Amino acid sequence: MKKVLALVVAAAMGLSSAAFAAETATTPAPTATTTKAAPAKTTHHKKQHKAAPAQKAQAAKKHHKNTKAEQKAPEQKAQAAKKHAGKHSHQQPAKPAAQPAA
């Protein structure tokens, strides 16, 4: 039953049944004995030691004084002025309607 199932699967995969039967009939080749290879030479890499940074107190690390604070802050504007700063009104004053001459 297993051979029939194997043949059906092989036929479905596109293999010829004769090639599959020949493949299954042959006994697997014995594994070749492996010779022990010489171990690879290991190279040792030396680490480069970096210079230690200067030690600081913990508070000095946390509270850096910004040089930007010394600069003058930009002038504050209202929100609407920020939005419409670049817009100019291009409307011309409305002309009075032409009145018919009576």
From Swiss-Prot:
Residues 22-41, 91-102 have a biased composition (Low complexity). Keywords: Periplasm, Signal. It comes from the Bacteria. Proteolytic processing gives rise to the active protein. InterPro entries: Acid_shock (IPR023497). The keyword Signal applies. Residues 22-58 form a propeptide. Residues 22-102 are annotated as: Disordered. Residues 80-90 have a biased composition (Basic residues). GO terms for cellular component: periplasmic space. It holds the Pfam family Asr. Residues 1-21 form the signal peptide. It is found in: Periplasm. HAMAP family: Asr (MF_00546). Required for growth and/or survival at acidic conditions. NCBIfam families: acid_shock_Asr. Belongs to the Asr family. This is Acid shock protein. It comes from Escherichia coli (strain 55989 / EAEC). The lineage of its organism: Bacteria, Pseudomonadati, Pseudomonadota, Gammaproteobacteria, Enterobacterales. The gene is asr.
